[in-house]
Design a protein with these regions (language model features):
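One-carbon transfer enzymes
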Residues: 1-195
Length: 195
């Protein structure tokens, strides 16, 4: 596979599954960007994000800006060909979005434009939806408003809850990215504007 300079940005478990899927399929990630470590529990011990744990297991450098809007020099210095995000947790500035030659793509846990913004998986459960899904989109300065490359539906079963749907979405996200990865990196991806 061509040596591409790829950054992965994400924080929770769903994102760690996507990162693992990329690595297991020989997609070399050269830098991981994730939220800063947080203190948790009564002893206030520092806890790493699930994405950071995967990065460290694979000896991938990790960048953890407190506010990416003002602290993104490490990303500029890396000069990526592609940035892949999934549940990163901060709005990525335009200076970063404009940098990679293949763009910045995001995996979002709903069938956009439905449930733009935070907690899309939980909102599908709360609203009693029968179907949800994953969207692969090109990032834009406005949250979850960029054009969509592909979507994959997931049936929500009566016994599903947020945890089980997160697990389904994580697998779906990795599969969706893999099925369109070469299309993205060849510059042949056709994105469709959202309604």
């Amino acid at each position: 596979m061509e040596n591409r300079r790829i950054i992965f940005m994400g924080t929770p478990k769903i994102a760690s599954v996507v990162l693992k899927t990329m690595l297991e399929n020989d997609i070399h990630v050269g830098l991981v960007v994730t939220q800063p470590d947080k203190k948790k529990g009564r002893k206030q011990q520092l806890v790493y994000s699930e994405v950071k744990e995967v990065a460290l297991e694979h000896d991938i450098p990790v960048f953890q800006p407190v506010k990416i809007k003002s602290d993104y020099q490490a990303i500029l210095d890396f000069n990526p060909d592609l940035i892949v995000t999934c549940a990163y947790g901060q709005i990525v500035p335009k200076e970063v979005l404009d940098l990679p030659r293949y763009g910045c793509v995001n995996l979002h846990g709903s069938l956009l434009p439905k449930y733009r913004g935070g907690a899309p998986i939980q909102r599908a459960i709360w609203n009693g939806d029968k179907v949800s899904g994953m969207s692969l989109m090109k990032m834009a300065p406005k949250m979850d408003a960029g054009p969509v490359l592909a979507q994959k539906e997931i049936e929500i079963l009566p016994e599903d809850n947020s945890t089980s749907l997160f697990d389904k979405m994580a697998i779906c996200a990795g599969e969706l990215l893999l099925s369109h990865f070469e299309e993205i990196c060849s510059g042949k991806a056709v994105y469709v504007e959202q309604d």
